[in-house]
C-alpha cells in the first residue's frame, strides 16, 4: 500500500508469524527482508523543469520508532513528520544520493515529480523505494511553502502539455489481419 502500511518488524518466529498474518490483510504477496538496525532513512526528489532536471537537497525523515511509520510521516507535528533538511550527512554521500536520484529519473523516463527513498547503512547507500506519486508531491523538498511550489507545478504542467502535444501526432495502433483466423466468420467456423 505504501506509506509503511502493512510493514512489521519481527525478532523471532512468533513475531514473524504475526507479521506475516498482518501483512496478508493488505496484499496477497509479501516481501520478507533481513532487519537492519542503526540505519538512516534519506529522501531525495526530482522533476524535469524547462532547463533540465531539478534534484532536491537530501532530507532525513526522523522516526519516533525503529521504522518510519504512517503516523510518523503524516500525523506528526504540523501534519507531517519531523525531518532534518538538508540532511546532516557527509557532502559526498548527499551528492551520491542526488546523482542516483537523477539517474533513476533519466533511466526510467519519468515525468513529473518523483521521490526516491534510501537507507544509509554502514556507509553504504541502498535504494529503498521509488515513489512516482509522492505524498504532497514532495513540495517540501523544493519549497518552504505551497505558494512557492505553485511556480514549480506551473512549470511541470506547461512542460507536460508540450510533451503531450509531441506524442499526440504518433500512432499508437497498427491495423493488421495477422491475428485473423482463416475460415472463421463471425466467431463460427465455416463448413466446407
Model-inferred region functions:
Residues 1, 75, 133-135:
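Short connector loops/turns at beta-strand edges and beta->alpha or beta->beta junctions
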Residues 1-9, 19:
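Phosphate/diphosphate-binding glycine-rich loops and adjacent basic-rich segments that engage nucleotide
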Residues 2, 47, 108:
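Short glycine- and Lys/Arg-enriched binding-loop motifs that mark or flank ligand-binding interfaces
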Residues 2-3, 82-83, 136-140:
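Short small-residue beta-strand/loop micro-motif enriched in glycine and branched aliphatics
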Residues 5-6, 84, 109:
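Short, flexible active-site loop motifs that bind/organize anionic cofactors or intermediates
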Residues 6, 43, 117:
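Conserved beta-strand and immediately adjacent loop positions that scaffold enzyme active sites
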Residues 11-84, 88-92, 120, 124-125:
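Phosphate-binding site of ATP-dependent enzymes
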Residues 88-192:
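ATP-dependent carboxylate activation and anion-phosphoryl transfer catalytic cores
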Amino acid at each position: 500500500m505504501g506509506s509503511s502500511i502493512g510493514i512489521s518488524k519481527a525478532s523471532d518466529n512468533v513475531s514473524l508469524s504475526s507479521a506475516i498474518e498482518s501483512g496478508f490483510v493488505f496484499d496477497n504477496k509479501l516481501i520478507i527482508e533481513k532487519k537492519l538496525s542503526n540505519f538512516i532513512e534519506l529522501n531525495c526528489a526530482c522533476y524535469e523543469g524547462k532547463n533540465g532536471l531539478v534534484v532536491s537537497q537530501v532530507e532525513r525523515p526522523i522516526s519516533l520508532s525503529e521504522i518510519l511509520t504512517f503516523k510518523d510521516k503524516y500525523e506528526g507535528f504540523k501534519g507531517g513528520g519531523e525531518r532534518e533538511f538538508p540532511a546532516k550527512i557527509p557532502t559526498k554521500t548527499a551528492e551520491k544520493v542526488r546523482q542516483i536520484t537523477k539517474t533513476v529519473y533519466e533511466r526510467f523516463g519519468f515525468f513529473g515529480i518523483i521521490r526516491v527513498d534510501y537507507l544509509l547503512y554502514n556507509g553504504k547507500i541502498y535504494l529503498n523505494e521509488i515513489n512516482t506519486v509522492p505524498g504532497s508531491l514532495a513540495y517540501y523538498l523544493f519549497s518552504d511553502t505551497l505558494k512557492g511550489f505553485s511556480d514549480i507545478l506551473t512549470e511541470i504542467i506547461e512542460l507536460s502539455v508540450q510533451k503531450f502535444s509531441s506524442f499526440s501526432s504518433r500512432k499508437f495502433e497498427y491495423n493488421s489481419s495477422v491475428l485473423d483466423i482463416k475460415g472463421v466468420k463471425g466467431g463460427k467456423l465455416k463448413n466446407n
